From Swiss-Prot:
Domain of life: Eukaryota
One Pfam family here: Ribosomal_S7
PANTHER family: RIBOSOMAL PROTEIN S7
Quaternary structure annotation from Swiss-Prot or TrEMBL: Part of the 30S ribosomal subunit.
Cellular component GO terms held in the UniProt record: chloroplast; small ribosomal subunit
Organism annotation: Calycanthus floridus var. glaucus (Eastern sweetshrub)
InterPro entries in the cross-refs: Ribosomal_uS7, Ribosomal_uS7_bac/org-type, Ribosomal_uS7_CS, Ribosomal_uS7_dom, Ribosomal_uS7_dom_sf
Family under the similarity heading: Belongs to the universal ribosomal protein uS7 family.
Name of the protein described by the UniProt record: Small ribosomal subunit protein uS7cz/uS7cy
Highest classification ranks of the organism: Eukaryota, Viridiplantae, Streptophyta, Embryophyta, Tracheophyta
Subcellular location: Plastid, Chloroplast
Length: 155
């Protein structure tokens, strides 16, 4: 047992311009090699492009995209009796959002396009509409969980 006290729970900070935690989560996931100012630049340019494309509130588009991509259930490999089963497990809201952001960024990196801001804005708009690679990934995950429903008792 640890002799230390209990660790303080860290609260997620919000970004300086929009004061939004989702934007901050997105910035922290897009971050590479410690270049946070570049990550902020990419996200803010993407938000401006979303504003130009949809002519609606870009933060609501971002929220809707993340909400649509967030999975309810996923599969986890579990070794039982010498064989590995894909066991469906429910996902919490924070972990679901983190997965959704990861999938959105992965899908936008694979997209053809000029720069990351353009690709990210396109993927977010598509996800908000209900199409795109990230949505496909979510549906694929849900299909896997449904197919392996028989192993749900292995939790």
């Amino acid at each position: 047992m640890s002799r230390r006290g209990t660790a303080e729970e860290k609260t997620a900070k919000s970004d300086p311009i929009y004061r939004n935690r989702l934007v901050n989560m997105l910035v922290n996931r897009i971050l590479k090699h410690g270049k946070k100012s570049l990550a902020y630049q990419i996200v803010y340019q993407a938000v401006k492009k979303i504003q130009q494309k949809t002519e609606t509130n870009p933060l609501s588009v971002l929220r809707q995209a993340i909400c649509r991509v967030t999975p309810d259930i996923a599969v986890k490999a579990r070794r039982v009796g010498g064989s590995t089963h894909q066991v469906p497990i429910e996902i919490g809201s924070t972990q679901g959002k983190a997965l959704a952001i990861r999938w959105l960024l992965g899908a936008s990196r694979k997209r053809p396009g000029r720069n990351m801001a353009f690709k990210l804005s396109s993927e977010l708009v598509d996800a908000a509409k209900g199409s795109g690679d990230a949505i496909r990934k979510k549906e694929e995950t849900h299909r896997m969980a449904e197919a392996n429903r028989a192993f749900a008792h292995f939790r």
